[in-house]
Structure formats: structure tokens, C-alpha cells
Amino acid sequence: MNTYLLRTSLAVLALSLLGGAGAAADLSLERIHADPPLAGRLPRQAEVSPGGQWVSFLRPSQADSEVLELWAQPSDGGEPRKLVAAADLLGGAEQRLSEAEKMALERRRISQRGITGYQWCGSDDRALLFPLSGDLYRVRLTAGGPQAQKLALPPGSPKLEARCSPDGKSLAYVQDGNLFSLPLTDGAKPTPLTRDGSATVSWGLAEFAAAEELARQRGYWWSKDGRSLLALRVDESGVAVKTRAQIFADRTALTEQRYPAAGEANARLAAFVIDASTGAQRELPLPAGCSRSRATRPG
């Protein structure tokens, strides 16, 4: 009898708990899509710094999970700390993205705003580089805390695909289809490494087929000593122009872009070794077939 009563009591308790859980689990469609996300504010692009002192990552803002901030945590323990947020640098201004930047983020499957990418600059674990609203910023890790500074570069079109040299003494970037190098010293001016960039010719950028089909998001690479770069020149003049729809929350727009449809022409590629100081170029022969947008990556 006691066993029967015990089993009955447990059954009643289980049913009551299930009923409560069912009531608590009721979610509206609005809550499912509201902020904060039910899965939590998950970090992305986690990296260990070159010297192993830090673990860096992008973290959604507490105010808006669609805005990413740059954070880091000591690798030997300690609390994570925010290094910089877009709002700290833009001063209330709205973040700007060019069409080229939007397409690059789309190819990386990134829908958030704010600081959407970064890299460690050099091997001493003291500086990181990131793009924001068409400009480039460097944040230094100092004894007094992180200090972010916008790099003094010529105004105009956004600086794309910025990458520091392995020693952290220089960086390269793409602007208006051309590749530039810049020593990271006070008062230094960028050096144009190429000059024939145009609406159909670009240097140092991954074209559509490379990014979508070959998982190659880069178009140039620094040498280990930081003295030269391997860069791809992309000629899309033979790629057909297609019209595609862009769907926004409140409207739909039509835009034209060069799109290598199946069975049609791809972009033509050429590879060059470029001196980072002078821009002197030496063309490298590509394997058969790679000249038509089928180069994967060095090595």
C-alpha cells in the first residue's frame, strides 16, 4: 500500500511539473525574434593572439545583439574586457557601408553591424586592426587600458581587406580597386602598389566565384618578412552583367552586378609578387585553368 501511494504521489507530482513546464514554455512569435536572443549573446571569430597572451572575440552588444563589439580575455584567466565598440568611435553617427562592403559581409554570411572583423597586428600582442564605416582603426593594449585610434588615410572610397604585415610594421589595403601599403609610423603616407584598378579590374580582392565556390575570401598575402606581397589581379570585363533583387525590410531594389552564371565566362586572374616599398611587380605563371577564376590560395 505504501508503495502504491508513493507511486501515485510521484505521478501526480510529475504531471504538475509537466503542466508548469508547458505553461512556462509558451512563447510568442514576437518574443522568439526579440532582443535578447533566446540562445544568448554568443561570441564569434574567437582567436588566440600571436603571442598566446589573449583570447579575442566579437561579442554582441548588451544594448543590441545585432551590433558586435571587440572583446578580449587573458588566456591565463581573468575577466573578459571590452576593447572597443563602434559607438565609442562614431560619436552617434550612423555606420556607413558601401555596396562593396555589404557584398563582402554577405559572402562571409555576416548580417550584424558594428565591428564585424578584426586581426592582431604584429606578434607582441599589443595591437589589433579593424575596419569601421569605411575607415581603419588600430586599438593598442596599454597599461592604462585599450586605446583606439583612426589611422590617418586619404579620404574617399572605403579601405577594404586591410591586413597587417607579420611583423606589425606595415599594413596593406585595397581602395578603388588598387592595392596600397602603409608603414605604421607617425606621418607615413600610403604607397600605391598598383594603378590600373577600375570598375572591371581589381587587385587583392576575392571575386565572386572564389568567395562563393572556393571558400577563398582573400586576394593577397604578405610574405613572412613583410617585404613583399603575393596579389591577384582580377579582370571581370568578360563577365556578364546580371540584374538581381535586393530585399530590405521596407522595400525591394534592383541592382546590377557582374555574375558568372553557370556555363558563362568567369573572371580572369593573374598573380604577381609586389615589393611593398616600391611597387615593383613580377608576374607568376598560374597552373592551367587557374587564370579563369579557379585559383584557391597559396601553397
Tell where the protein language model's regions lie, with residue ranges:
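Bacterial N-terminal signal peptides
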Residues: 8-19
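Beta-propeller folds
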Residues: 23-299
